[in-house]
Amino acid sequence: GYFGSNDPAFVPTAHEARYGVSRTGFGYRWHEADPRFDLTQNRNEPNRFGWIVEIDPWNRASVPVKRTALGRFKHESVIYVVGSDNRIAFYSGDDERNEYLYKFVPAGSYDRNDPIANRNLLDTGTLYVARLNDDGTGEWLPLVFGQNGLTPENGFADQGEVLVKTRQAADRLGATMMDRPEWIAAHPTTGELFMTLTNNSRRGNTPASSNKVDGTSAAASANPAVNAANPRPDNDFGHIIRWRENGSDVAATGFSWDIFVQCGDKATAKTLGSTYTPGEFGGQTVGYQGNIVGDDYGAPDGLWFDYFGRLWIQTDQVGNATGDWVNIGGNAMLCANPDTGETRRFMTSPRNCEVTGVTSTPDGRTFFVGIQHPGEDWVNTVLENSTWPDSGFNGPTRMSANGPVKPRSGVVVITKNDGGVIGT
């Protein structure tokens, strides 16, 4: 969406369209200011994006490294889990409607006592994509050149091309299309993994369609049917799934899964439609009211476990709290009990923003929470929606000595009045 072309004759290739590249992009118009983003001049530039980059924060002289073995897609996050045998796995979701869940298992093992020995773990290993079966089981399908149709006859010349065209490789293997997979969090003691599925307005639309096996579907263009892992059509409010690797082995190629929660609004009048029957797939399906135990929320995005095993959920819904969101209100960060599912709202956001990113000091007494793009969805001026974080200092005029106050992203620091552990 950040690339574009002023050439009216520009037509994206099937590979470019699979990654959302188009002549007009998302309207950012970067290509008009920087030729790097002009597809007419730099056709290969989009292939340099979509990779996980590793940075060593302790070494100022270090050079960031693109970890290409983890695949090329819209990595919303990456989380790792170290097994009891010191094998390690890295999990990541592709932040797009109808995309996939991935796992990378290095060939080597993690050495807890030698950080230098771990620096090259991400160079060699196996990238997998998930298939979630309706019976609650799942499979990790290897994205390996020469296997499962990833061959020159199907457009893959070598492992490098499999990685550059990760989405097409996953299409070829028949992975499960998910409702916009985003953040993943690992329980610090049980090893269970949780993933947010933010929304999917195309789920259950007619005529039904899937990502084409030959990889020629444009990004977010298919209308997948509902299934056990994505059981609601027009999944406005999203849900969170949970899975466990077989044998608690991070390198396992099988897992079991269930839905942790289906988000929603208990007071909404929105219905699933006369042609859809709640209760399919073993009773997992609920209406748009959701099955939250506690405070309502929707569009789950950020996800994080604190040191004490509490699950923190951050939302990325339409930021003006109207329409389907009028009862829920603005975006928020909530805390959930992973055992009971009980959820309580912890904080709400400024207007028209996303709450994203959270960490804490090791003692759990100070939280750092990201506030992203306040004032989004503006029509004429961003000042109509937000002047955060300066709005509290400039009064109703929203003016400073230097002119109009514009909204900015930022990080807030949160502590308890009594200095105690947050969440207690």
PLM segments and residue spans:
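Conserved small-residue
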Residues: 1-424
